[in-house]
Structures are given as C-alpha cells and as structure tokens.
Curated annotation (Swiss-Prot):
One of its GO terms (molecular function) is identical protein binding. Inhibits potassium fluxes in cells. May regulate Kv1 family channel proteins by retaining a fraction of channels in endomembranes. Residues 5-74 form the BTB domain. Pfam families: BTB_2 (PF02214). The keyword Endoplasmic reticulum applies. Keywords: Endoplasmic reticulum. The gene is Kcnrg. This is Potassium channel regulatory protein. GO terms for cellular component: endoplasmic reticulum. It comes from Mus musculus (Mouse). SMART domains: BTB.
Amino acid sequence: MSGQDLVTLNVGGRIFTTRPSTLKQFPASRLAGMLDGRDQEFKTVDGQIFVDRDGALFSFILDFLRNHELLLPSDFADHHRLQREALFYELDSLVDLLSQFLLQSRSAVMEVHFLNQNTQAFFRVFGSCSKTIEMLSGRITMFVERPTALTGNRNSPLALPPQRPSHHDLLFHCGSDGAAENQAGVRYISIKPDNRKLANGTNVLGLLVDTLLKEGFHLVSTRTPASGEKSECYVFERITTPQVLGMSKTPKSETTTMPAPSQK
C-alpha cells in the first residue's frame, strides 16, 4: 500500500492515519469536504491535515466512520462534547445517535410513600416514567375479601387494580377495613410474578421494594417519619444507558487506523 492510499490527520496534536474512503463515508460531512477541496478551513502542514479540534474525542468519531456504530466505555461521560464535535464535522447520523443515547440514558425516579395506620397500610407510588407506572399497575392486584355474612363465600375475593390518579402515580392499600376482621373486608396485595396475597403493610412494602430492585432501580434516599407520624418515603433511581448505538446500514470493515505518537 502506497502513501497515497493513506491520509494523515493531526487533530489537536494527536495523529491519525486512515484511508480516504473512511473519511468519505458520509459525503456531506466536512471530513469528506476536506479531501475534495470543498472545505478550505483545513490546511495541510508537513503532509498532515491539521484539524484544530479535540483529538481524544476524534478517535470515537473515526471508529464510527469505520463501523457505522458507536461503542463507548462504560464510564464515558462526555456525550455532549462528543455531540458538539459531531456537529462541527457535520456528521448528522452521529449527532442523531448521540441524541438518541442522551434520551435513552435519562434517569427514571420512583417515590414510594408508605403510611401505616392502625390496621391498614396505604401506598402511593410516583414515577417520572409513565411506562414504569403502567408496568407496576399491571402487576399489582388488590384482593378484597368481604365478610361471610355479606358474600356467603369467603373464598372468592374481589380482584381490583390499583387506582391511577394520573399517568405518573398509583394508589393502593391493604389490611383490615375495621377493628375486627368479621366486621369489614380485608384487602390483600399481590405483585406478579409473586403469587402470594399479603395483607401486612410491612410485607407488601418489602415485596414492592424487591420488585423495583429487580427492575434495575436502586435506593438513593429515605425520609423517616417525623415525631408522631407514621408515613415513610423511599426514593429509587434507575439509569439506563445503551452500550452500543448502531445505524441500520451495514458497517464497512475495509478501513484501518494506525495512530502515531503526537508531534510537538
């Protein structure tokens, strides 16, 4: 392979060598424009095209040009800066992928309010993500067992969904509705896939917390009740970040990158 088959770029002091076809993957980009003379901002110095941009982030851009997918380290935190670099190079596909990444990686917050009052326990679950609330609503069932004198059949409890005041919260409660079990109904809570029907508020709280943990949430804070109160609040957070963002187009594998030491 001759030197004419390669292009060397000095991006912010870091040297990258690749094929012209790699830089022309997206013909409308400024990287393609620097090779065909459309973009006069980039100058050739000592056989290298100088680009006054972030060299460390350019390695991710070059990898995207090679494979048409973006693979970032798990601890990568410069998504906005990388998107800014993609905007500079006019790589619209990469800008769109990063916008998708930032949208998908937004954190979801859940608040569980728990009030233990006499023989009943009341729950209110608030979520920033309505889809998570919808998922919980489909898994939580309240079973209302009425006294035998009213129903004649104690073994056929009435199944009810939790209340949905809005798209972002749900309400339910469990326990006995009266001082004596034979005077009023008893509400049990079941949370799928667990088949148990629980009436004790503390047990239901434990099952609800376990359900959220299995869904990828982690507990970030708690608020203990003030003196004379019995309400508690548990705050959970879940951050989902895709590891690989790819385009629908089949990646090309013909490109090669050969980094060289930085020149002073």
